[in-house]
Every structure is written in C-alpha cells, then in structure tokens.
C-alpha cells in the first residue's frame, strides 16, 4: 500500500491505499468525504490536482493527455503507484 495525502478544504487527510483500490473508494471506507458523481472516471466531479507522486488513471475517460500531464486526477478512477499528495475539490478550477 502507498501513503495518500489529500489536501482538502477541511485540512490534510492521510491514509494508506492499496495499489488496487481507487483513492476515492479508500477515502470513503475511512469516512473521508470527497466529491464524486459518476464513479466511472467519465465526469469531473471528483477532480483533483496531483502535487507529487505517480498514479494509474488508465480507467478514466474524461481527462485528455494534456490535462493528465498538467497533474489533473479523477480520484474515482486513480490507483496509487507511489506515495501521493493530491489537492481535492478542484472541479471548478478544471472546468472553469
């Protein structure tokens, strides 16, 4: 498992996430409230920004390659591939 640190409006939340569990699912298991809608990687409700680390987001279909390179992440379809730090609640910034 990897360490996940979420920078939320309520302050930082840290937890361990296995590499085969989506970050959103693991956060919910632990009672951390995060925004989501489709849970399938095809909308922007759960969008966040990767501050550091590596993710596998191959299951998502909403973000384009450029957005992924810029660090955008859909927490409902992201597996950790290293320890990660993610800013959450970023949908407005992504969709403007």
UniProtKB/Swiss-Prot annotation:
Sorted UniProt keywords: 2Fe-2S, Chloroplast, Electron transport, Iron, Iron-sulfur, Metal-binding, Plastid, Transport
Cofactor: [2Fe-2S] cluster
UniProt domain 2Fe-2S ferredoxin-type: residue ranges: 2-92
Cell compartment(s), UniProt: Plastid, Chloroplast
MF-aspect GO terms: 2 iron, 2 sulfur cluster binding; electron transfer activity; metal ion binding
UniProt main location, coarse: plastid
Binding site for [2Fe-2S] cluster: 38, 43, 46, 76
ATP-binding as UniProt keyword: no
Similarity field: Belongs to the 2Fe2S plant-type ferredoxin family.
Protein name according to UniProt: Ferredoxin
Organism the protein comes from: Leucaena leucocephala (White popinac)
Cofactor binding summary note: Binds 1 [2Fe-2S] cluster.
Impact upon substituting residue 12 to A: In 50% of the molecules
């Amino acid at each position: 498992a990897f360490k996940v640190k979420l920078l939320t409006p309520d302050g930082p939340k840290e937890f361990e996430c296995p590499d085969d569990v989506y970050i959103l699912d693991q956060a919910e298991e632990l009672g951390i409230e995060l925004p989501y809608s489709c849970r399938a990687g095809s909308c922007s409700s759960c969008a966040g920004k990767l501050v550091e680390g590596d993710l596998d987001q191959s299951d998502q279909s909403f973000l384009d390659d450029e957005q992924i390179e810029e660090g955008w992440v859909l927490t409902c379809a992201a597996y950790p591939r290293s320890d990660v730090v993610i800013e959450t609640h970023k949908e407005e910034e992504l969709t403007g």
